[in-house]
């Protein structure tokens, strides 16, 4: 153990502690070097400050010189100085945890790295690179490194806490940003890249997962483990192995194994496309096929893509890295910031502006449909119970405990309302015996029974399931449980399930379009028959029976 620790201390000397300065701007930090000598190594000599940050003892006979000694340096932070809370994220060799400093009550995102794992997986260069790059950055659109410390087993990086998490979470939640939101967040990313490239740094893994949002919903770019600091005479960096993420990797990295500042501009083009369309431009079943599409520039714009945003993306997704808008060969960031897409942007104080409310945009898919806008602002913090009428709620899906009159006889056909061969819904006032008969009938003749785990289907029908600007036909199956399954009707494959919880809430937008809100995502669905309100009504009915008639189910 001693040798392992010594190796890491030699390879990853944590010598600098970044501390807050008394500047009015929260983005300002000051780097304080503790010592020019390596930190103490167990079993070795200790000529510099101790690792706990206390000053070294004065040498005997040096009393006459004590007045010339520098003041003692601040005590190095230790794990016991913090109360550690929830896990914010996990990487291949690190965990990020929310922590509150006991002395100041300040919150930090502390990145904890296991020394043994770093050495075993040869990740020492990633750790040192991330620390070195972050110590160079002083800009409001980047996560800040405030301090570093270590114990015998772990390294700790104290980072600014981006309270609202990843940009990707919001893309998945609302599907497609409206033009105002797309413009604002693209402008912040451009401003950040201009600063980063001005420092001679290439990020090399820019993607929505690595763009966080702080408490005020401004961006904070993070994850510099694969970043590269260019030497003054170099314009590009060689990559001996693949770095980055498949959907956002630039063609020059695939063909020449080199990355340049313009590689980040390619990733910017992919991100803009994803903000508008809801999905990245290059998509396929595996990484090899994605790479083939990238090097052939094979991608399409969906209908209703904002025209000015499309023009900008086309000027960024260019195979020749020297022809991308914003690169040095194209006169830098001036022409990029002057693009018509940004004509209403005030660049000077973006970090002080109030971000627009996140608003989903669902353009009409045909001339007969309407555009839909979904204001996501209230959904950020409010997912209370649906306030719906509890009239005639039953304790189960059977009629035995309800106040509703039971229908006479055992003719189960009276409960089934067929709309067409692939659409029907059930009345819910059936007995347990009738439910058994309905389930037998379903198992024997309904081709969708195989997808619902032997649950009774209460309503089903084809819908167009929207994800951003893309739509796919699905068979939607509302069942007991409750469950909301959706199936590919052509390939007969179960594609997924809308997660049920007490916070689930249906919302009809017009005759065809309805939303199903869940805490982590809003599902956008369109009923081609124009009966969106019937889906919402049936979902509400099942929701009431699940949560208002079974209060204990809400905490399960």
UniProtKB/Swiss-Prot annotation:
The active site is at 205 (proton acceptor). Homodimerization regulates its activity by maintaining the kinase in an autoinhibitory conformation. NPRL2 down-regulates its activity by interfering with tyrosine phosphorylation at the Tyr-9, Tyr-373 and Tyr-376 residues. The 14-3-3 protein YWHAQ acts as a negative regulator by association with the residues surrounding the Ser-241 residue. STRAP positively regulates its activity by enhancing its autophosphorylation and by stimulating its dissociation from YWHAQ. SMAD2, SMAD3, SMAD4 and SMAD7 also positively regulate its activity by stimulating its dissociation from YWHAQ. It holds the Pfam family Pkinase. Residues 28-38 have a biased composition (Polar residues). Appears to be expressed ubiquitously. The Tyr-9 phosphorylated form is markedly increased in diseased tissue compared with normal tissue from lung, liver, colon and breast. Induction: Stimulated by insulin, and the oxidants hydrogen peroxide and peroxovanadate. Gene3D superfamilies: Phosphorylase Kinase, domain 1, Pleckstrin-homology domain (PH domain)/Phosphotyrosine-binding domain (PTB), Transferase(Phosphotransferase) domain 1. Disulfide bonds: none annotated. The modification Phosphothreonine is found at residues 354, 513. SMART domains: S_TKc. Phosphorylation on Ser-241 in the activation loop is required for full activity. PDPK1 itself can autophosphorylate Ser-241, leading to its own activation. Autophosphorylation is inhibited by the apoptotic C-terminus cleavage product of PKN2. Tyr-9 phosphorylation is critical for stabilization of both PDPK1 and the PDPK1/SRC complex via HSP90-mediated protection of PDPK1 degradation. Angiotensin II stimulates the tyrosine phosphorylation of PDPK1 in vascular smooth muscle in a calcium- and SRC-dependent manner. Phosphorylated on Tyr-9, Tyr-373 and Tyr-376 by INSR in response to insulin. Residues 113-157 are annotated as: PIF-pocket. Changing residue 394 to A: Abolishes phosphorylation by MAP3K5. It catalyses: L-seryl-[protein] + ATP = O-phospho-L-seryl-[protein] + ADP + H(+); L-threonyl-[protein] + ATP = O-phospho-L-threonyl-[protein] + ADP + H(+). The modification N6-acetyllysine is found at residue 304. SUPFAM superfamilies: PH domain-like (SSF50729), Protein kinase-like (PK-like) (SSF56112). GO terms for cellular component: cell projection; cytoplasm; cytoplasmic vesicle; cytosol; focal adhesion; nucleus; plasma membrane; postsynaptic density. Keywords: Acetylation, Activator, ATP-binding, Cell junction, Cell membrane, Cytoplasm, Kinase, Membrane, Nucleotide-binding, Nucleus, Phosphoprotein, Serine/threonine-protein kinase, Transcription, Transcription regulation, Transferase, Ubl conjugation. The keyword ATP-binding applies. Serine/threonine kinase which acts as a master kinase, phosphorylating and activating a subgroup of the AGC family of protein kinases. Its targets include: protein kinase B (PKB/AKT1, PKB/AKT2, PKB/AKT3), p70 ribosomal protein S6 kinase (RPS6KB1), p90 ribosomal protein S6 kinase (RPS6KA1, RPS6KA2 and RPS6KA3), cyclic AMP-dependent protein kinase (PRKACA), protein kinase C (PRKCD and PRKCZ), serum and glucocorticoid-inducible kinase (SGK1, SGK2 and SGK3), p21-activated kinase-1 (PAK1), TSSK3, protein kinase PKN (PKN1 and PKN2). This is 3-phosphoinositide-dependent protein kinase 1.
